[in-house]
């Protein structure tokens, strides 16, 4: 079964060339890559102008689950559109299909080429500054370390940036993905070393060098590093499956309570770090935990599939709502709903069945354009 946490063998065939050469870029120095310090990546909970979704599932990757993946994306799209505008990127020949599945209320469609559905990883990282200007950062998507063909997806960040008003998006010297970035919008980030300090993306880079570049690109003053784990999923343990900022000083973390899961030890280690960490302003973090369901519903997506990754951390915060998953485990689903409702009291928690994409999740298949413009 092809899920996000599976190494997709039939399409992982980019090899034999240097990383920079394969991307068609030069890995220029930190000074050239750095954004002006006033630029920052907003917290997801700040007002959004619109959300994004990439309707890019194809049978070469998803096989017999393609229609199910599209249907799951449709549920996500329609839920978002109840609260704010949504743009769906889609292929020209699937434009009508995308609208039939994702709807027309509050949804616009932009035709472009795509390899897959993971818009969080392949899209532009939109930044803002104190003057109200909009910028964007492109982290040179390389298929999570050349594990999947990605030539079309690699072009989406620059395409989306220009489409929404950023004539010259900044291209980082780093290779990485949006799902590997978590920020509070006030100078603190959480990242996993397994994703960023990895030779399949950034060969020869030390953690210190990676940190300097991320700080410069995203307007960060401090990064809290979690170890993650390399090689167990296609992303090398993106942070958006492990820890999320609710607001500055408050974090919700994934805590796997199943001793048989490799994530049991990983999440315990992460929790220990987060409980003693301080943010850029010196505050000790208030840490809440959400545990994956121990009894998710039996389905053809989860059956005999050790890579099925059911977790509640991968939710998407939008204007007025939190779009979150449910997995058919009444106790765990209710616990997730209750905690998220308490953490986001001004937002409605909307839980959706997304089993077909639960090797990734709702956060992985969405991204956002922040509200920008100089305040009155």
Residue ranges and their predicted role:
Residues 6-28:
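N-terminal export signals
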Residues 32-376:
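The feature marks the mature, well-folded catalytic cores of soluble enzymes
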């Amino acid at each position: 079964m092809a899920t996000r946490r599976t190494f997709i063998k039939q399409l992982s065939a980019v090899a034999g060339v240097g990383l920079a050469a394969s991307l068609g870029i030069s890995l220029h120095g930190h000074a050239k890559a750095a954004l002006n310090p006033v630029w920052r990546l907003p917290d997801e909970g700040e007002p959004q102008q619109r959300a994004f979704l990439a309707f890019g599932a194809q049978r070469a990757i998803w096989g017999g689950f393609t229609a199910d993946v599209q249907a799951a994306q449709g549920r996500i799209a329609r839920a978002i559109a109840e609260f704010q505008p949504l743009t769906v990127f889609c292929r020209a020949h699937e434009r009508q299909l995308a609208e039939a599945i994702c709807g027309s209320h509050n949804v616009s469609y932009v035709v472009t080429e795509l390899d897959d559905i993971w818009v969080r990883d392949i899209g532009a990282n939109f930044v803002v500054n104190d003057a109200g200007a909009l910028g964007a950062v492109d982290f040179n998507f390389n298929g999570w370390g050349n594990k999947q063909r990605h030539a079309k997806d690699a072009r989406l960040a620059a395409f989306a940036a220009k489409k929404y008003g950023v004539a010259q998006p900044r291209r980082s010297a780093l290779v990485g993905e949006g799902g590997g970035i978590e920020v509070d919008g006030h100078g603190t980030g959480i990242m996993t070393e397994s994703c960023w300090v990895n030779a399949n993306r950034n060969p020869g880079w030390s953690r210190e060098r990676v940190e300097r570049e991320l700080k410069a690109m995203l307007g960060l003053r401090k990064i809290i590093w979690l170890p993650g784990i390399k090689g167990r999923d296609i992303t090398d343990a993106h942070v958006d499956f492990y820890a999320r900022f609710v607001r500055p000083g408050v974090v919700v973390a994934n805590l796997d309570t199943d001793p048989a899961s490799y994530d049991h030890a990983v999440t315990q280690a992460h929790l220990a770090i987060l409980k003693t960490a301080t943010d850029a302003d010196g505050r000790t973090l208030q840490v809440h935990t959400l545990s994956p369901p121990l009894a998710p519903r039996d389905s053809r997506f989860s059956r005999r599939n050790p890579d099925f990754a059911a977790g509640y951390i991968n939710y998407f915060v939008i204007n007025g709502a939190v779009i979150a998953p449910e997995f058919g485990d009444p106790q765990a689903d209710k616990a997730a709903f209750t905690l998220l409702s308490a953490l986001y009291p001004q937002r409605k928690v909307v839980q959706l069945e997304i089993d077909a994409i639960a090797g990734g999740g709702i956060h992985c298949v969405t991204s956002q354009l922040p509200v920008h413009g100089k305040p009155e």
